């Protein structure tokens, strides 16, 4: 692509109702200032994508339809998988390179002013006195602090909010200071005589985001020493507790992340050790456990390991788990499944719900799998959860949430609804003070989503697989920087306009996902419709011939 054309991407409807834009009728409050939709299920009409590129030669544009991006080349501009890992299909930009606009910005502003942004004022686990993560005491040393920091920190970087960034650094500086001579960092928690690494798994993600934003080399040193400690830990002491064992795939991703920066061979050995000691999510007709968050978060572990094993059976296993849980417990709108806290036979109808943690972890898994596989299925599924399920779990001002949200959610009260709901407690009520894990973990949802609105492709181009208003600075071709502006109210409207700005002429490919729910889509450049049959569930690859 060069620079000053207009591209129109036209996606007329199928003759069927779909649930992608299902909006709950819960409150007259409309913080996004967007017209309310009147129907629970809407008939898709038309999606229009306008694309402005600053050039004059339209007939030099070539559009092809592809199942996946071209991985025969290696991206020269961003850190990506190095051998022996399989090539990534898409590469995430560093946090902060994508700026939200429109409703995505409004949501982050609401989150900043809401529960996630002010959780430190009401959460005992974020109390800075006697806090194990700050080294001021021995309390609150498990998952809550890093859960909160995942969303809060990334929101701070995206908004470039100096006060929030300083608050984030307060916690991370304590993490740096906590590293022991043997490499372990953070509060040391034992369960059954073994170290519990689950809280540290989350914190390593916080550190990765901080490195992307700041370039602070202390992150690399800390993680290198910590993973050497993990490698030296006897296998009968490694990942044996329920949570860390179920979610070892998060550790595996962090190992890959560091390996792609340093190339240290010991990390490949540790990756094998991590996979070996993680719960088996490769079973054909059952799961290692039926906990909703474990499933939403851990079903991607086989596909993550596929990056190292290159065994297609590992990749297929992730798809199998995704469909297995939904074939039994997921015959409901919104992309999720009934597991409130755990999925149970006999409780398979729309009254069953999912934790708010389950929503955001499913979105994160979809985003990761989009990068690993390039399959547009994961982008579309992420949109489904993000637009239909996740918003229903919170009040419109994002100042309160509930633990369990069901597709057929007819009541929000503080009663115990067990055994209809698996977990005992007041878990259908909106409450800023309850739901300990979701209270801290919910904040990752929108920041992570925004970070995936624009991706880099292996062939030094740009990919847009999930749509939303934003502006991104992206390095393309041989390192030239372009700005891509996505102007849209999607999914509340059905048009998307792209403008690409550069200082010099530059050629690069652009991938646009063609949703499965459209008939006869088209692309128009500067008002002229391109003569090309687009295919649903694939990508339009636009390039200069």
Annotate each language-model stretch with its function:
Residues 1-60:
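Bacterial Sec-dependent N-terminal signal peptides
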């Amino acid at each position: 692509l060069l620079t000053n054309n207009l591209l129109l991407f036209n996606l007329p409807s199928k003759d069927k109702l779909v649930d992608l834009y299902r909006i709950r009728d819960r409150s007259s409050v409309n913080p996004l200032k967007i017209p309310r939709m009147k129907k629970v299920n809407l008939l898709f009409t038309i999606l229009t994508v306008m694309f402005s590129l600053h050039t004059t030669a339209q007939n030099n544009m070539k559009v092809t339809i592809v199942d996946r991006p071209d991985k025969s080349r290696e991206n020269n501009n961003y850190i990506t998988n190095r051998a022996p890992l399989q090539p990534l299909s898409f590469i995430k930009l560093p946090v902060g390179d994508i700026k939200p606009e429109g409703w995505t910005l409004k949501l982050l502003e609401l989150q900043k002013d809401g529960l996630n942004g002010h959780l430190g004022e009401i959460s005992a686990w974020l109390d800075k006195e006697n806090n194990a993560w700050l080294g001021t005491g021995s309390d609150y040393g498990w998952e809550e602090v890093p859960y909160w920091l995942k969303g809060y920190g990334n929101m701070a970087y995206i908004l470039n909010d100096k006060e929030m960034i300083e608050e984030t650094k307060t916690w991370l500086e304590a993490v740096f200071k906590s590293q022991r001579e043997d490499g372990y960092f953070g509060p040391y928690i034992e369960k059954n005589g073994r170290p519990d690494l689950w809280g540290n798994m989350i914190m390593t993600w916080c550190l990765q985001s901080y490195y992307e934003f700041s370039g602070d080399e202390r992150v690399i040193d800390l993680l290198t020493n910590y993973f050497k400690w993990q490698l030296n830990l006897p296998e009968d002491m490694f990942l044996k507790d329920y949570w860390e064992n179920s979610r070892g795939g998060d550790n595996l991703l962090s190992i890959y992340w560091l390996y792609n920066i340093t190339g240290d061979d010991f990390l490949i050995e540790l990756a094998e050790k991590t996979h070996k000691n993680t719960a088996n999510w490769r079973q054909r007709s059952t799961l290692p456990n039926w906990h909703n968050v474990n499933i939403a978060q851990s079903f991607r572990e086989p596909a993550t390991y596929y990056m190292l094993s290159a065994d297609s059976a590992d990749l297929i296993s992730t798809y199998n788990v995704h469909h297995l849980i939904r074939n039994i417990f997921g015959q409901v709108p919104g992309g999720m499944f009934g597991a409130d806290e755990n999925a149970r036979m006999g409780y398979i109808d729309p009254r069953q719900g999912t934790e708010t943690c389950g929503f955001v972890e499913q979105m994160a898994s979809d985003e990761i799998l989009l990068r690993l596989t390039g399959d547009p299925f994961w982008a579309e599924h992420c949109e489904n959860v993000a637009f239909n399920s996740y918003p229903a779990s919170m009040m419109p001002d994002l100042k309160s949430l509930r633990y369990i949200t069901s597709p057929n959610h007819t009541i929000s009260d503080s009663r115990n609804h067990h055994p209809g709901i698996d977990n005992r407690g007041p878990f259908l009520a909106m409450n800023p003070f309850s739901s300990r894990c979701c209270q801290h973990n919910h904040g990752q949802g929108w920041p992570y989503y925004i970070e995936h609105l624009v991706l880099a492709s292996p062939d030094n181009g740009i990919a847009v697989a999930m749509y939303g208003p934003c502006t991104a600075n992206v390095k393309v071709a041989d390192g030239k920087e372009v700005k891509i502006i996505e102007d849209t109210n999607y999914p509340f409207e059905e048009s998307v306009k792209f403008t690409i700005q550069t200082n010099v002429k530059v050629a690069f490919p652009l991938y646009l996902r063609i949703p499965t729910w459209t008939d006869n889509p088209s692309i128009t450049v500067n008002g002229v419709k391109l003569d090309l049959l687009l295919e649903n569930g694939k990508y339009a690859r636009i390039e200069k011939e």
